[in-house]
């Protein structure tokens, strides 16, 4: 395997040379014997900031590939007492050894095992699950492997089922009814969290989001794990519901059950999806710490993008409602000229943009107030 050295953050690692695995002038990371995707640098950059605040004694990257994620945590975030890197691909495990040595890390433990098998053998304060596709096969094992109110970080790249395009796949993987709705970019994340909560409950544990976001073609989610059947029951009863959207007028709201419910505005039957999580997507105290800290990482290649994302999330996080997609709402209302988002925000007064969609707004003001602004500004 021919290797190429690349720099990401403050580390230098060897990866399979893309030139050796191109097909008709194109390259996909999955074609190489060991997976490395430079497009996920933004994901890893933000994760470096998160781990720097958590300072876990034990870090476990269960699906390490080249080892880039765990190595960056150790070099840039926090020199943990123990760094555990694993990949079931023997070629990847060998490459991890090279990259660990290349970055002067002496206390790393490298495994060549199935991720689930390893997670049932050892415990960790911070576990990273960054698979190719869905994280569902690793939810139970990773939640079970946490200690001391540990953290599990999940990446999900299978947006088709989560956003309602592949309804059968969503039912199979996430045990949720789903449709493509106006706010599906956010609802997909909520379906993912809901699935994790239900899986954790079977272990008499529960999870709460610490920080989460959507970017490019994936969701990234950090959850804190708590033990106790009562806590699991309380979280399910309080934060797992369904979501309804009116296909005629665009009104949307959380609903208690998956049953025929009529829109209170126009009387049309709701399209209902779920179950899904209805609580906050971020821990506000932790979010504030991220905002206070991220400037220390101005060397990151995606620093400006991180700054922009955190600024938007800081503003939208205070609102409890799912965002409204103004473009799709205007289409349902047959408003041909969509008003500028900034003008709608000014009209509403108490509202913000959302990082989920460029034409989305988040506010706890009522549907009628939003419609008034949209129509008055056209």
Swiss-Prot record:
Its EC number is 2.1.1.216. Zn(2+) binds at residues 246, 249, 263, 266. Belongs to the class I-like SAM-binding methyltransferase superfamily. Trm1 family. It catalyses: guanosine(26) in tRNA + 2 S-adenosyl-L-methionine = N(2)-dimethylguanosine(26) in tRNA + 2 S-adenosyl-L-homocysteine + 2 H(+). Dimethylates a single guanine residue at position 26 of a number of tRNAs using S-adenosyl-L-methionine as donor of the methyl groups. It is an enzyme of class 2 (transferase). PANTHER family: N 2 ,N 2 -DIMETHYLGUANOSINE TRNA METHYLTRANSFERASE (PTHR10631), TRNA (GUANINE(26)-N(2))-DIMETHYLTRANSFERASE (PTHR10631:SF3). S-adenosyl-L-methionine binds at residues 44, 69, 87, 114-115. Pfam families: TRM (PF02005). SUPFAM superfamilies: S-adenosyl-L-methionine-dependent methyltransferases (SSF53335). Residues 4-374 form the Trm1 methyltransferase domain. It comes from the Archaea. The keyword S-adenosyl-L-methionine applies. This is tRNA (guanine(26)-N(2))-dimethyltransferase. GO terms for biological process: tRNA N2-guanine methylation. GO terms for molecular function: tRNA (guanine(26)-N2)-dimethyltransferase activity; tRNA binding. Gene3D superfamilies: N2,N2-dimethylguanosine tRNA methyltransferase, C-terminal domain, Vaccinia Virus protein VP39. Keywords: Metal-binding, Methyltransferase, RNA-binding, S-adenosyl-L-methionine, Transferase, tRNA processing, tRNA-binding, Zinc. InterPro entries: SAM-dependent_MTases_sf, Trm1, TRM1_arc_bac, tRNA_met_Trm1_C.
